[in-house]
Amino acid sequence: MDAPYRIRSAVPADAAPLVAIERRCFSDPWSETSFREALDSPWSFGLVANTGQGIAGYLIAREVAGTGEVLNLAVSPDFRRRGVARALLRAGLVYLRKRRVEEVFLEVRESNRSAQALYLSSGFRPVGQRAAYYRNPKEDALVLWLALEQHA
């Protein structure tokens, strides 16, 4: 890998660089306020992959009553295909397992084949669909699920 990275907890002060990545990755990006609220919430957490050049990617997830949900995962186009997304996802699942979470859900755009490949290869399985879940452009979401006790 060209630029080594380390995974660390995200803090509200990371919101601006996360928005910059978000805008490069998604057509309907989260706002800085959305990131700050997620990172300030007692039910959610964030992880970032930090390089010598700044933040390469992030994961935002939450846990409620034994169920986890990956809310957002993105890697800057400059750092893709280097294992950053997989490392963030793996670290997020470890964190959720330590919190005694038993299952994890996420939504992914039907057209986002690379993200689907990551999630499926990490043990997630399709369990449903949400019609017109995404805006700009309007698109259905696949709902994926992972049983953490089976994913060690």
Give the residues covered by each predicted segment.
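C-terminal "cap" of GNAT-fold acetyltransferases
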Residues: E102, R109-R113, A132-A152
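Conserved catalytic-core motifs of GNAT/GCN5-like acyltransferases
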Residues: T33, V64, E107, L120, ...
